[in-house]
Amino acid sequence: VLKNVQLQTPMQVFAKDGLLINQFGEKRRIPVTIDQIPEPLLHAFLATEDNRFYDHIGIDPIGIVRSALVLISTGEKKQGASTITMQLARNFFLTREKAYIRKVKEIFIAIHIENLLSKDEIFELYLNKIELGNRAFGIGAAAQVYYGKELKELTLAQMAMIAGLPKAPSALNPIRNPERAKARRNVVLGRMLEEKYISRAQYDEATNQPITAYFHGAEIDLYAPYISEMVRAEMVSRYGIDKAYNSGFKVYTSVESDVQKA
């Protein structure tokens, strides 16, 4: 299943010359390959979510022992016992069962995923699948939704902000809760510093950056609502609303953008 996974991606409608007229879908997603992701962004997720990702087999015994010790000594459940692979297993395959049953299944599925995919394939799939708030799924969409940028254009502070979202995409949302998001961003930067992914100077500069996130809608190049509605209705008629909206269809019309603008 994971070797040929089809992520839910919105349908896009284009003019003849490739200008975007509209898009339809429940989720905003811009799939990216791992070689398109800036190294500091990869490091931000590793430092925050699973700093031993490239060393373990899908589960991290060291992380599990640490979490158990914290639970025994303080009574608090420590975040971080779930590896990136376990989170991927949860996102794809698991339902809302009792926590201990789900965790056991998570472990076995994670080990299976590690035998099926390479580490880079797992990491890439995770970064494209993960929910990051404001209907943004995957880091490509998050960069666009919060900053109106491509991944390569993000600052270190912005990358850390995005990497802090998986823990609680709504509660830590920089648009709705900027102060909580800033605190979480600085935690991410602190972990990057601890793991020696960034220098003290980079940490100081990034933690002093203001919150710059605000909502960016889809970048529509050509306003033609009548055309896009005709396409939408036809695609829904042919494929049904779920497949039409979530299969990543790119529909090119015969509309000439210069004529439409005139």
Enumerate the predicted regions with their spans.
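N-terminal type II signal-anchor transmembrane helix
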Residues: 1-13, 52, 72
